[in-house]
């Protein structure tokens, strides 16, 4: 289910990231959690591995986005909780599940925060004369007070490696790129 008024959604743990992104966009929302593996990984996997996404600067990590979840324990018992406000006493056992890799049970679904889709998305690249200048830029950007949702600094070796991993174009796409 999706609750637009309270900006929450209940999503099955096996839902693949790319499908979550597409379905929430229909309603004008995003979870904001997009790890590098978003095309193939699942919500339950993100919780079990304590995943961090490319847009964590704006939306937070998975533990900041998940409000609650259902868990099937080793004895087959389904743990289901109501969404409650933060409690100020003792440890929060729900936090132990993040990064537990399934040791405390299997996550079956989660209730997550939703955010409105951004009005504008811009992508670009900046070249620096050396890596140190790039690090200085990243430092200044972080201290401006309004960090971008996603920013990444890569050196030339990493860039060349990632380009080498891209599949070669074929057919019409290959012909078009030669023009």
Question: How would you describe each model-predicted region?
Answer:
Residues 1-152:
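FAD-binding subdomain of flavoenzyme oxidoreductases
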Residues 149-179:
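Terminal amphipathic helices with adjacent charged low-complexity linkers/tails
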């Amino acid at each position: 289910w999706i609750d637009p008024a309270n900006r929450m959604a209940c999503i099955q743990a096996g839902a693949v990231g790319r499908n979550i992104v597409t379905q929430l966009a229909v309603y004008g929302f995003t979870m904001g959690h997009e790890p590098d593996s978003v095309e193939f990984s699942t919500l339950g996997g993100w919780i079990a591995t304590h995943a961090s996404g490319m847009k964590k600067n704006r939306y937070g990590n998975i533990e900041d986005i998940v409000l609650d979840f259902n868990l099937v324990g080793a004895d087959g018992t389904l743990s289901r909780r109501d969404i409650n406000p933060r409690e100020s006493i003792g440890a929060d056992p729900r936090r132990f599940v993040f990064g537990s890799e399934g040791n405390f049970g299997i996550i079956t679904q989660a209730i997550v925060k939703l955010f409105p889709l951004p009005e504008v998305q811009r992508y670009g690249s900046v070249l620096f004369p050396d890596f140190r200048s790039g690090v200085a830029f990243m430092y200044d950007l972080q201290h401006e007070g309004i960090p971008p949702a996603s920013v990444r600094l890569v050196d030339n070796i990493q860039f060349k490696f990632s380009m080498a991993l891209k599949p070669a174009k074929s057919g019409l796409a290959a012909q078009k790129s030669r023009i």
